[in-house]
Amino acid sequence: MLPEAKLDLLLARHAALESELLSHVSADRYVQMTRELAELNPIVDAVKNWRAVTAEIAGIDAMIADPATDAEMRAMAEAERPALEARNDELMQKIRVALLPKDAMDERNVMLEVRAGTGGDEASLFAGDLFRMYERFAALQGWKVEVISASEGTMGGYKEIVAQVQGRGAYARMKFESGVHRVQRVPDTEAQGRVHTSAATVAVLPEAEEVDVDIRPDDLRIETMRAQGAGGQHVNKTESAIRITHIPTGIVVSMQDSRSQHKNRASAMNILRSRIYDAERQRINAARSADRKDQVGSGDRSERIRTYNFPQGRVTDHRINLTLYKLPQVIAGDALHELIDALTTEHQAAQLAAEGGA
């Protein structure tokens, strides 16, 4: 059964917002209301459709039970009922999912970090492939990707790249990408045609705001230095590069991508803030995980989550045992949504089961 009283409150809230929109409101209030309406619209539509279907089912049941109904009409009603039952179940499930507790971070922008792991140059190339996959996926969502820092590999790709992904719901869609991604393929430099295995680590952090993390100046060790290029040579004469250490956690962020020390410091603080915030969230989630099973995988960055097997053209997500034989489309970013959708559905099913709603 669905919580009818709660659904009535949602419908009333939706109607009140629509009515208020017709009055004179400030620009800020207008933006706030349209955002809330956009969040309510899907569940309100589902509730209205569900109630219409239940009323239709009740009408059919009454027709079937009525002795005055002739045989032909009764047969037609009985034939229509299974489709309506299926639609009813579908709408009820949609409503249950919409009523699940939301992650407060889901609407946040994302700090995306991709690092080459084991595998040398091939790992750097794979890290580059992964970053371009996410870049394309973000573009398809209408999001903006801004590279904050990048360390290129000697043969291409990246040893490490950090970017900000800006867009509504970015964290909700990308949060299950954190973990170790493994690739199996024949490198261009492999003369014998042997398949090599390499890896890259992906971290997806919700962008933290200043109010989320209290960073005391006394807890920071800030060092400046001259930026270095490939081979270690200094590339400018001013100390624009910066390294910030958060002493309590030991988290270190280095930044030298801009010639401006001020910009490098601002970027480093932004990354540091998100890493500190994420570390605390990880600690809390780890403490809770013993009591709940509503996560897709452990969320541990050291967990191997996915394998990209180029010779077989397949991608396997190990958390949900899903294999897609469309590796080119996934690595291009065009079919990544199929994996993300499946992970989201699995996560929601686990949440429903934990709440006794499945």
From Swiss-Prot:
Keywords for this protein: Cytoplasm, Methylation, Protein biosynthesis
Q: Which residues carry this modification: N5-methylglutamine?
A: Q233
PROSITE patterns documented for this protein: RF_PROK_I
**Does the keyword section mention Lipid metabolism?**
no
Indicate where this protein resides in the cell.
Answer: Cytoplasm
Entry GO terms, CC: cytoplasm
Signal peptide residue numbers? none
Query: What exactly does this protein do?
Result: Peptide chain release factor 1 directs the termination of translation in response to the peptide chain termination codons UAG and UAA.
Designated name of the protein:
Peptide chain release factor 1
Q: From which organism does this entry originate?
A: Nitrobacter winogradskyi (strain ATCC 25391 / DSM 10237 / CIP 104748 / NCIMB 11846 / Nb-255)
